[in-house]
Amino acid sequence: MKVGVLGGGQLARMLALAGRPLGLDFAFLDPAADACAFALGRGLQGDYDDPACLDELAEFAEVVTFEFENVPAAVTERLAAR
């Protein structure tokens, strides 16, 4: 299964460390170019509301989850529409 994660920090890294042995593949969207989770999957560096990054994440992922709770509602609506 391919999992998209909004956020690429410590929690996203721990999620990937737990999921990779189960055969899960990950993509992370984070504004920081050096997000620590990027080492464990596909790293998408960009703002959370960047349409191109969101589309790329949606193309990759079968399911999307969040690393943190402050994701703009418009972002989740855009992903849900895909």
What are these regions (language model features)?
Residues M1-R82:
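ATP-binding N-terminal substructure of ATP-dependent carboxylate-amine bond-forming enzymes
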